[in-house]
Amino acid sequence: MSKVALITGVTGQDGSYLAEFLLEKGYEVHGIKRRASSFNTERVDHIYQDPHTCNPKFHLHYGDLSDTSNLTRILREVQPDEVYNLGAMSHVAVSFESPEYTADVDAMGTLRLLEAIRFLGLEKKTRFYQASTSELYGLVQEIPQKETTPFYPRSPYAVAKLYAYWITVNYRESYGMYACNGILFNHESPRRGETFVTRKITRAIANIAQGLESCLYLGNMDSLRDWGHAKDYVKMQWMMLQQEQPEDFVIATGVQYSVRQFVEMAAAQLGIKLRFEGTGVEEKGIVVSVTGHDAPGVKPGDVIIAVDPRYFRPAEVETLLGDPTKAHEKLGWKPEITLREMVSEMVANDLEAAKKHSLLKSHGYDVAIALES
């Protein structure tokens, strides 16, 4: 009989990759999606199955991590073997604008799920995975960061996720639940939301190359991050629930790059070589040379990268670097996709969209490129 999995945040980057992964393993997959005024299922449309078909394996449920009765009803109906809590208000900058909502969804939402599992008597049947975050380390106490590194969160998002981390540990220890945290370092893909810095970079570089934008504005380009591919990370999430005993794991590559280096890699994919001049808010990224045919919209001397202080965080997280040794040694997990391969994939995806917009523009159509304010 097929295992049954329930994924919160199924329409997001990780949720969609995880749903694909589990379906390939023969699972019956149920996902929770929020009601929206427009369709927000584009990341899972390709695996959607008409409920009228015979024995569908993928199901969507309307729900919200702020609604206890809704979550309890879904858990009662689905009776999952595994729950993956990937749903969250996950944008660090936005969490400063909406701290109460962030706490309600990210912290209390995790508690609601754990308590619903316990209330329904599923604590011995259902295994629970909590998507934690490297943002817990914040003002880092040691480099690299591992499972035993002290936490020092620096945003409402990270503080909410800290509660979620510890309540997961508490329910594991108090009620004998199979509940564990995956401390995820930054992970990206072509499905990454467009307001996150990596996707903002690859999308803007593609648009600039096609003459649809003139300049990409960023915040702290000195920030150092450990970036992996979401496909690799969802595999590790599944592996964590297949052990005999629940444990918490860091999920990371163990390799670190700056935001500036990410920009340089993305530009290089389109034959654009950059040099950076100035410091702080005066720093600029200037085109040195252009090769190939993918960047007709830029020329040497163009300033295509600049700093906007609006994108600085109230409390910066300067450096994050994970130590995935425990994952390697205990589960045999290691990332398979390199950063350069991931950047290439993301840029190619965004370039395809930019070329379509450029073609429409060349035929006289107005093309509105949605940009982050």
UniProtKB/Swiss-Prot annotation:
Effect listed in the UniProt record for changing residue 133 to V: Strongly reduces activity
Record key words, sorted: Lyase, NADP
E.C. number: 4.2.1.47
Cofactor(s) the protein requires to work: NADP(+)
Residues binding NADP(+): 9-14, 64-65, 86-90, 101, 161, 187, 192
GO MF entries: GDP-mannose 4,6-dehydratase activity; NADP+ binding; protein homodimerization activity
Pathway: Nucleotide-sugar biosynthesis; GDP-L-fucose biosynthesis via de novo pathway; GDP-L-fucose from GDP-alpha-D-mannose: step 1/2; Exopolysaccharide biosynthesis; colanic acid biosynthesis
Active site: 133, 135, 157
Taxonomy, superkingdom: Bacteria
Residue stretches spanning the membrane: none
Name of a matching Pfam family: GDP_Man_Dehyd
InterPro entries in alphabetical order: GDP_Man_deHydtase, NAD(P)-bd_dom, NAD(P)-bd_dom_sf
Consequence of changing residue 157 to F: Strongly reduces activity
Catalytically driven reaction(s): GDP-alpha-D-mannose = GDP-4-dehydro-alpha-D-rhamnose + H2O
GO biological process: 'de novo' GDP-L-fucose biosynthetic process; colanic acid biosynthetic process
Function: Catalyzes the conversion of GDP-D-mannose to GDP-4-dehydro-6-deoxy-D-mannose.
Family (UniProt): Belongs to the NAD(P)-dependent epimerase/dehydratase family. GDP-mannose 4,6-dehydratase subfamily.
Subunit comment: Homodimer.
The protein's name: GDP-mannose 4,6-dehydratase
Organism annotation: Escherichia coli (strain K12)
Phylogenetic placement of the source organism: Bacteria, Pseudomonadati, Pseudomonadota, Gammaproteobacteria, Enterobacterales
Gene name of the record: gmd
